Swiss-Prot record:
TM region(s), chain numbering: 243-263
Annotated protein name in UniProt: T-lymphocyte activation antigen CD80
Modification after translation: Palmitoylated by ZDHHC20; palmitoylation protects CD80 from ubiquitin-mediated degradation, regulating the protein stability, and ensures its accurate plasma membrane localization.
Any Pfam family: V-set
Organism: Homo sapiens (Human)
Locations listed in the record: Cell membrane
Length: 288
């Protein structure tokens, strides 16, 4: 009896086809690796290069487009430049430096992929002469978060709050203890409409009768920042409530009052006699 072949394991009829496919994939990988990546901080200056040169004489026959995700940034047609409103007064076109654009005072919204397209007039038509892509990453580092704590009245529960602000991109906050993620009470993330920067805060309740070590971890993009909060219980003797029954407390109180009365009765005559002797002594020494 012959062996049956499992489906999907038939040998290739044309091994050269697989080799050709590998060559195509390698070529695509090489092409994709040509994308330029630029990373800058908020409010910094970013220079995005088109990687192509055009002489002054060729400008009249050349069209240059800079766009971000299909939205126009800048155009140069027949030597006339036009900058779109979002980039006006903060974008410079550097023709002599590989047709680069220079974006001033970076905003978080400037992040994205930019395309530079160069068209040249040839044989009664504009044909594409060059295409380049530049990926711009804009970041703002979050400061080390702060953790404040306060006690909730009439309970053994304590609450801690972790917060930080002024970072980008959008953060994700989590609480960890011994490597395990905990459930927070309330986590809020907000973005300033003007600066486009984020703020984040979160609350966590815990039982203050046991020791704890919490980590507040904030991830944003490929970066992270964290703060640790340690709680150590104080070693105190805890006496049970109502150590003595009420009748015993009453008996002790009555006995205490009785002892005080006895002491007063015993010492009162001595005090009176001492005062009487003092009075007689003063009278005996009084001059006639």
């Amino acid at each position: 009896m012959g062996h049956t072949r499992r489906q999907g394991t038939s040998p290739s009829k044309c091994p050269y086809l697989n080799f050709f496919q590998l060559l195509v994939l390698a070529g695509l990988s090489h092409f994709c690796s040509g994308v330029i990546h630029v990373t800058k901080e908020v409010k910094e200056v970013a220079t995005l290069s088109c990687g192509h040169n055009v002489s002054v004489e060729e400008l009249a026959q050349t069209r240059i487009y800079w766009q971000k995700e299909k939205k126009m940034v800048l155009t140069m047609m027949s030597g006339d430049m036009n900058i779109w409103p979002e980039y006006k007064n903060r974008t410079i076109f550097d023709i002599t430096n590989n047709l680069s654009i220079v974006i001033l005072a970076l905003r978080p919204s400037d992040e994205g992929t930019y395309e530079c397209v160069v068209l040249k007039y040839e044989k009664d038509a504009f044909k594409r002469e060059h295409l380049a892509e530049v990926t711009l990453s804009v970041k703002a580092d979050f400061p080390t978060p702060s953790i404040s704590d306060f006690e909730i009245p009439t309970s053994n529960i304590r609450r801690i709050i972790c917060s930080t602000s002024g970072g980008f991109p959008e953060p994700h906050l989590s609480w960890l203890e011994n490597g395990e993620e905990l459930n927070a009470i309330n986590t809020t993330v907000s973005q300033d409409p003007e600066t486009e920067l984020y703020a984040v805060s979160s609350k966590l309740d815990f039982n203050m009768t046991t020791n704890h070590s919490f980590m507040c971890l904030i991830k944003y993009g490929h970066l992270r920042v964290n703060q640790t909060f340690n709680w150590n219980t104080t070693k105190q003797e805890h006496f049970p409530d109502n150590l003595l029954p009420s009748w015993a407390i009453t008996l002790i109180s009555v006995n205490g009052i009785f002892v005080i009365c006895c002491l007063t009765y015993c010492f009162a005559p001595r005090c009176r006699e001492r005062r009487r002797n003092e009075r007689l002594r003063r009278e005996s020494v009084r001059p006639v």
